[in-house]
């Protein structure tokens, strides 16, 4: 079962439809306790990095996501979700990320 993390800023339906069309089983995860029902995770995202991290924090997703990935559960970040896997982002000021991927999201110089 592929869990799609629903923290209020994702393109959930598009990601779910893509997985289903590839014949994958999908569970939209809106409660961190449901992560343990999944074999892998997708972290989608549309919007600003800081707000996304605030949403993940207020929904209490950060520790369960990090723990599951550290225990070997695969995770795929889509759009903003990939940025969130990094250590930080400088979008609208430096904000700490999940730290699951080494590196920081930085602005490309003109």
Label for each model-derived stretch:
Residues 26-37:
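Short acidic low-complexity segments
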Residues 35-45:
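Short acidic/histidine-rich motifs immediately flanking catalytic phosphotransfer sites
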Residues 21-28, 56-59:
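Short gly/ser/thr-rich secondary-structure transition/capping motifs
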Residues 15, 41, 52:
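Conserved S/T- and glycine-rich ATP-binding loop of Class I adenylate-forming
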């Amino acid at each position: 079962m592929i869990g799609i993390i629903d923290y209020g800023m994702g393109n959930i339906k598009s990601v779910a439809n893509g997985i289903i069309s590839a014949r994958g089983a999908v569970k939209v995860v809106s409660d961190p306790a449901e992560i343990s029902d999944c074999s892998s995770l997708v972290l989608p995202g549309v919007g600003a990095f800081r707000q996304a991290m605030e949403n993940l924090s207020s929904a209490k997703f950060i520790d369960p996501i990090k723990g599951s990935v550290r225990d070997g559960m695969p995770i795929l970040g889509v759009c903003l979700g990939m940025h969130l896997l990094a250590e930080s982002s400088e979008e609208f000021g430096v904000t700490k990320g999940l730290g699951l991927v080494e590196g920081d999201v930085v602005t490309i110089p003109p």
